[in-house]
């Protein structure tokens, strides 16, 4: 991709972001007019300390894929979502698209959740580029299985400054693009979607108590209404940091990707506020700029003005 084209897209994104922040009266700590939108830097474009705390990386793109991300704090006291995407030099291996994107939603107090999600995303991301990227001797199934156990142990062992267990946890989703194949990992209730031909398909399954309640619905033990109104329906039954990690979702067969496909990774802060059709509409409006689309998705969630808005994060991967 030419530098001039990249610059135009980044400038369009920055213009929209500035207008949005001004309209919503969120004060940014970055002077967007002076932000360098260079293709070499996947630098932070917006990070504010106002009501929502917007964090977005500048566009990552080559001739094969576009990658964008955005994260907002919502109305919480801390940002416990963690998002890790590759830089330009980590997208290709010998002209072969090969990269990993990771998202995690932490839980466990002001600092516990933040540390748990950061531990999960950074461990998986670093290990992927150390083990799988150049000299791959493992299958994705074996790699993801081993990483799930490793990360669960690491998160469970996190301690505070006094040496006391943090008792924190985190969801974890990861999408690995390898040529025309998609491999993914899921622990918890963050989601991965595939948008193809105007339709949005959820690839992962939520690992929460509602899953077990719906099994009882199918067996006739309770009604669907009872399941959907159960006070503990959203409680996680699998997450990084749990005593015994028994539920890890990995696709056994790689998903074959097509030109025009968009892979969406998001925390529950997004899909609980936006319908699938609302997400599709944003993606269709901003089809050629995944960074702007990511920002618009988190902005749309924020515009719902939900009093208890959770941290909201999204990663978008478009196959050209």
Predicted regions located by residue number:
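PP2C/PPM-type serine/threonine phosphatase catalytic domain
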Residues: 1-320
């Amino acid at each position: 991709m030419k530098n001039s084209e990249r610059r135009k897209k980044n400038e369009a994104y920055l213009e929209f972001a500035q207008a949005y922040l001004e309209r919503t009266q969120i004060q940014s700590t970055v002077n967007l007019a002076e932000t360098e939108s260079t293709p070499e830097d996947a630098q932070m474009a917006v990070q504010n300390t106002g009501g929502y705390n917007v964090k977005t990386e500048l566009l990552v793109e080559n001739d094969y894929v576009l990658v964008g991300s955005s994260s907002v704090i919502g109305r919480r006291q801390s940002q416990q979502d963690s998002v890790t995407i590759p830089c330009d030099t980590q997208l290709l291996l010998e002209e072969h698209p090969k990269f990993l994107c990771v998202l995690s939603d932490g839980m466990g107090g002001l600092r516990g959740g933040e540390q748990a999600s950061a531990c999960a995303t950074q461990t998986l991301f670093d290990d992927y580029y150390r083990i799988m990227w150049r000299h791959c001797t493992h299958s994705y199934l074996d790699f993801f299985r081993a990483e799930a156990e490793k990360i669960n142990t690491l998160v469970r062992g996190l301690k505070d400054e006094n040496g006391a267990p943090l008792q924190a946890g985190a969801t974890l989703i990861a999408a690995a693009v390898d040529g025309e194949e998609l491999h993914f990992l899921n622990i918890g209730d963050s989601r991965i979607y595939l948008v193809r031909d105007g339709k949005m398909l959820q690839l992962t399954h939520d690992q929460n108590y509602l899953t077990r309640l719906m099994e009882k619905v199918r067996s006739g033990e309770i009604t669907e209404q009872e399941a959907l109104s159960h006070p503990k329906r959203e409680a996680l039954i699998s997450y990084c940091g749990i005593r015994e990690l028994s539920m890890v979702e990995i696709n056994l067969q790689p998903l074959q990707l097509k030109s025009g496909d968009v892979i969406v990774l998001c925390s529950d802060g997004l899909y609980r506020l936006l319908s699938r059709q609302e997400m599709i509409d944003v993606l269709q409006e901003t089809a050629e700029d995944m960074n702007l689309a990511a920002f618009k998705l988190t902005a749309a969630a924020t515009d719902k003005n939900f009093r208890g808005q959770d941290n909201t994060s999204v990663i978008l991967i478009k196959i050209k």
